[in-house]
């Protein structure tokens, strides 16, 4: 309209342009999530409102929705979510956002997981989570009975005298036999090279002095079994967990073997930090 009412060229040549009314100034309303102009930050609105939640609340929300049903999930359909366990000290619901399926339950294992009422009550999350670790066979924390498997009866009958199912009999026959090894201290001698050495990495069958692995001479590279094997234990109290009143006792003839005990008071190694356990299938 301003172009139609007022001419675009001046009326008198050589004279300045006539006064021209500006078009009406409309000040558009800025959305509240955008800054009014550059240089001054305004309140921003996140693209996804659920991004405001922290990791813990986000995992709790997803776990709660997963309990209601699969149609209440927050992710896309036909997609899979994978939870990666990084650190055992991290909370279970932060490690994996799959609700109660945080860790798989191994049937028959010594570490069974049960839902414990606590801070995750109502969500069905397993807490606390126990992570099995390897324990030394000669440690006080271990139990020899846990390392023995029941011997299968190949006669085809159970203890009660009833006939066994052929499927169960096949499973017993296919079950692997474990041989648990125990670390001991051994003394070696090579007669060809006239060399003697000691080693604390002698793996014997648990409860016996039967050596499972041979050690090679560093000169002739021949495998040898130790001529003498002894347990890594205190030389005074004869226990893997030292109970002597003295803080330290050293055998001057073999100080290295004494230091490898690791359970005497004041020693360099401690029982909780020593892991020496192997098994062979």
Swiss-Prot record:
Record keywords: Cytoplasm, Developmental protein, Differentiation, Metal-binding, Oogenesis, RNA-binding, Zinc, Zinc-finger
Listed Pfam families: Zn_ribbon_3CxxC (PF13695)
Compartment(s): Cytoplasm, Cytoplasmic ribonucleoprotein granule
Keyword Zinc listed: yes
Gene Ontology CC annotations of this record: cytoplasm; cytoplasmic ribonucleoprotein granule
Source organism superkingdom: Eukaryota
Location (main, coarse): cytoplasm
Coiled coil ranges: none
Chain intervals annotated as zinc finger (3CxxC-type): 183-267
Keyword Cytoplasm annotated: yes
GO molecular function, one term: mRNA 3'-UTR binding
Tissue: Expressed in oocytes.
A GO BP entry: translation
InterPro entries: Zar1, ZAR1/RTP1-5-like_Znf-3CxxC
Assembly information from the UniProt record: Component of a cytoplasmic ribonucleoprotein complex together with eif4enif1/4E-T and cpeb1.
Family of the protein in this entry: Belongs to the ZAR1 family.
Annotated function: mRNA-binding protein required for maternal mRNA storage, translation and degradation during oocyte maturation. Controls timing of meiosis during oogenesis. Probably promotes formation of some phase-separated membraneless compartment that stores maternal mRNAs in oocytes: acts by undergoing liquid-liquid phase separation upon binding to maternal mRNAs. Binds to the 3'-UTR of maternal mRNAs, inhibiting their translation.
Domain notes: Disordered regions undergo liquid-liquid phase separation (LLPS) for the formation of membraneless compartments that store maternal mRNAs in oocytes.
Annotated protein name in UniProt: Protein ZAR1-like 1.S
Native species: Xenopus laevis
Lineage of origin: Eukaryota, Metazoa, Chordata, Craniata, Vertebrata
